[in-house]
Amino acid sequence: MQKVLAIVGPTAIGKTDLAISLAQKLNGEIISGDSMQVYQEVEVGTAKATKEEQAKVKHYLVDNRSVFDEYSVKDFVDEAKKAISEVAKKGKLPILVGGTGFYVNALLNEMQLGERNDEERGTSQKWEDYLKENGAEKLWQILNEKDPTAAAKIPVPNSRRTMRALTVIDRTGKKFSEQQKKIKPRYDYLIIGLNSDRQEIYRRINLRVDKMMGKGMLEEAKFIYDNRDKEHQILQAIAYKEFFPYFDGEKSLEDCVTQLKTASRRYAKRQLTYFRNQLPIQWFDPLNDLECEQKIINKVREWENG
């Protein structure tokens, strides 16, 4: 079974820097496991590796789609599988790096994602329309009635995951939680999780947002705002919709920046919750442990030789 190393963790923890360093030392190449970094038109808000960083180690699934393209988790899995095969053919180690837990899980494990077809799109649209009319709580209540086990694992505000579960239930006629139980590994994988003191992570998130504002964050958000009538996944990304009230003249820029920091901190918390509950992870602290990288390398070597 093909070996795949995965590096996961909350936003701003330092996944990119560590992954590049590990790839250089372990003869690896990087596959992005982030649902938003595939889009070409946005750089700052998606926290992609810079062009200089990408020049150090080859990256896959970065800048390979337009924000106007339809892109699902199945598309990601199909493309990532091809990337892993390509890396492996070179005799190198595929290193999956990302913060989108469901995407990472769907790639590393066999999951019944199904084909994207007109029926699926129609079912998904049904729940999107319901959400707009009734709100996240009522949407979640429907899932709770259909599949309490699945609902218990999905926070009420996380409408995207709720809609995904309802869509799968509609498409297959089976409970989402029962299908999750049938998961089996697609690869021989090792997942390295990065985490640290919560307040330090929050401080780094706030600092990152401030830096993003100096790199063109507002211009990217304006581009998304100007195209918001088109239905595309990037509208769900934290970093863009927080600025819409500013463009509408409803809030100050300062208030929107504060809202982005708050949303990013909440997202980091949700990321950690998913990783802890859904994936078998070896945890390390890159911010407080000076020997963190070497410990990870030792763990990877042990896994590679096992």
UniProtKB/Swiss-Prot annotation:
Key words, A-Z: ATP-binding, Magnesium, Nucleotide-binding, Transferase, tRNA processing
Reaction catalysed by this enzyme: adenosine(37) in tRNA + dimethylallyl diphosphate = N(6)-dimethylallyladenosine(37) in tRNA + diphosphate
E.C. number(s) listed in UniProt: 2.5.1.75
Top-level EC class as recorded in UniProt: transferase
Cofactor: Mg(2+)
Binding residues annotated for substrate, in chain numbering: 11-16
InterPro entries for the chain: Dimethylallyltransferase (IPR039657), IPT (IPR018022), P-loop_NTPase (IPR027417)
Binding residues for ATP: 9-16
Region of interest: Interaction with substrate tRNA: 34-37
Marked site positions, Interaction with substrate tRNA: 100
Any one GO MF annotation of this record: ATP binding
Biological process, per Gene Ontology: tRNA modification
Residue pairs linked by disulfide bridges in the UniProt entry: none
Assembly notes: Monomer.
Family label: Belongs to the IPP transferase family.
Function noted in UniProt: Catalyzes the transfer of a dimethylallyl group onto the adenine at position 37 in tRNAs that read codons beginning with uridine, leading to the formation of N6-(dimethylallyl)adenosine (i(6)A).
UniProt cross-references to NCBIfam families, sorted A to Z: miaA (TIGR00174)
Record-linked PANTHER family: TRNA DIMETHYLALLYLTRANSFERASE
Descriptive protein name: tRNA dimethylallyltransferase
Gene name for this UniProt entry: miaA
